[in-house]
Curated annotation (Swiss-Prot):
Binds three calcium ions (via EF-hands 2, 3 and 4) when calcium levels are high. Binds Mg(2+) when calcium levels are low. The lineage of its organism: Eukaryota, Metazoa, Chordata, Craniata, Vertebrata. This is Guanylyl cyclase-activating protein 1. The keyword Repeat applies. A lipid is attached at G2 (N-myristoyl glycine). Ca(2+) 3 binds at D142, N144, D146, E148, E153. GO terms for molecular function: calcium ion binding; calcium sensitive guanylate cyclase activator activity; guanylate cyclase regulator activity. Pfam families: EF-hand_1 (PF00036), EF-hand_7 (PF13499). Ca(2+) 1 binds at D63, N65, D67, Y69, E74. Keywords: Calcium, Lipoprotein, Metal-binding, Myristate, Repeat, Sensory transduction, Vision.
Length: 199
């Protein structure tokens, strides 16, 4: 991960770091979070297949050294990126998250599946359907019309479009995860709400 570790940690307050470390070590005494523990950590249970695939993809993007675990530094770097990262850093991460097959481009199917999964987990109440949102993204930023978004098209297109940037940012809002950490793992949502979100 290189410089990302130090930079991420420096941007956090001592209190935040302490809360995150306490939560991490309480839930994961080994210091290495597996995919299963990752799901438990954030209260992600009974997920639909598409939501489960999204969580796996998120885990893989947070596992910076690709060893199959998220250690504390990866955890801090990931949360810092998502919560405090600059727009271009977040957009690069979103792109990596959406590019499920890792081919360097996002196609309509990848974006649609991820948006559906995110909405299932976050219970987003957007007026636009996932299909309408996907079509809007491609209509606005697929410059060459090839049905795929390159990193450049994605970065430039989203940064130029405030509406698109706002919707993407809200869809990946992880404040519920921060509340979970601050509440020492006590989920602020009732269990029946979590089950509803999984369907």
């Amino acid at each position: 991960m290189g410089n990302m570790d130090g930079k991420a940690v420096e941007e956090l307050s001592a209190t935040e770091c302490h809360q995150w470390y306490k939560k991490f070590m309480t839930e994961c005494p080994s210091g290495q979070l597996t995919l299963y523990e990752f799901k438990q950590f954030f209260g992600l249970k009974n997920l639909s297949p598409s939501a489960n695939k999204y969580v796996e993809q998120m885990f893989e993007t947070f596992d910076f050294n690709k060893d199959g675990y998220i250690d504390f530094m990866e955890y801090v770097a990931a949360l810092s990126l998502v919560l405090k990262g600059k727009v271009d850093q977040k957009l690069r991460w979103y792109f990596k998250l959406y590019d499920v097959d890792g081919n360097g481009c996002i196609d309509r199917g990848e974006l649609l599946n991820i948006i559906k999964a995110i909405r299932a987990i976050n219970r987003c109440n957007e007026a636009m359907t996932a299909e309408e949102f996907t079509n809007m993204v491609f209509d606005k930023i697929d410059i060459n019309g090839d049905g795929e978004l390159s990193l450049e098209e994605f970065m430039e297109g989203v940064q130029k479009d405030e509406v698109l940037l706002d919707i993407l940012t809200r869809s990946l809002d992880l404040t519920h995860i921060v509340k979970l950490i601050q509440n020492d793992g006590k989920n602020p949502h009732a269990p029946e709400e979590a089950e509803e979100a999984a369907q």
